[in-house]
Amino acid sequence: MRRLLCLLLCLCWLPAISLTSARAADKAAETPAGLPAEVRVVSEVWVNYSQADGRGLAWDLLRAIYEPEGVRLSLRSEPYVRSVGLVQRGEADAWVGSYRNEIDHIIYPHWPYDVDPIGALGLKTSPRPTLATLDRYRLAWMRGYAFDRYLDHLKQRNELQRRSSALPMLDGHRIDYFIDARPELEEMIEAKGVDASVYHITDVGSIPLYLGFASNDRGRALAKLYDSRMQVLYRSGELERIFARWHWPYAPLIPLLPPKE
């Protein structure tokens, strides 16, 4: 009977011991400042921006933001829609390339980290559109991209699963223009086997880019640190040096950043 009582008492203590161990593990995974020991960031693969090998403007910028504060960058490459889902489920802390308030129940920092130049890719035989005339044409862009929420006249569209579908659809006259960030459009028509001379890209707008953080305590802490460090990098000139290292346009971001004091 005594042995049974002792066993029951031990079983009663197990949840408390497990909870204490979990809390200790969480505490060990924090920096001395109480921040998470790592920031888990997920992104679609973009050349010279967020490559799967850890190279690119976005990855260098995030290392400069977090690692001096003892927070290690843990990166992961996934398609855009899956990246958003991982953050929504708390399996990642943030994703790269969000537009502000694009997704509900996500924490957006105050400061953007880049500006997305948006272009319309079409056949050279097609007229050059303006933002005001785009609604006259058959448009397409990548699934999950919310261009229609941030640029007027982008209502009717096809959503594509793969960028590789865009050029055949243009060539077959199934769409008139493919909408995307200009660097992506340039990469498409500069690819091997593509005759760039039959296409043209028209700039139609720009949209500030943010990290989208998970709506939890980790996300709030990491977003707060991001805003603080962005100001430091901007005022020290390090932010501009990171952009220069990757030959990335910096001037469009300057009006959106805090004033230098």
Where are these regions (language model features)?
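Bacterial N-terminal signal peptides
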Residues: 6-18
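Short amphipathic alpha-helical coupling segments at ligand-binding clamshell hinges
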Residues: 57, 61, 133, 181, ...
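Short helix-initiation/N-cap motifs at beta->coil->alpha
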Residues: 59, 73-85, 158-172, 184
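A ligand-binding cleft/hinge motif common to bilobed small-molecule-binding domains
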Residues: 85-89, 98-106, 176-205
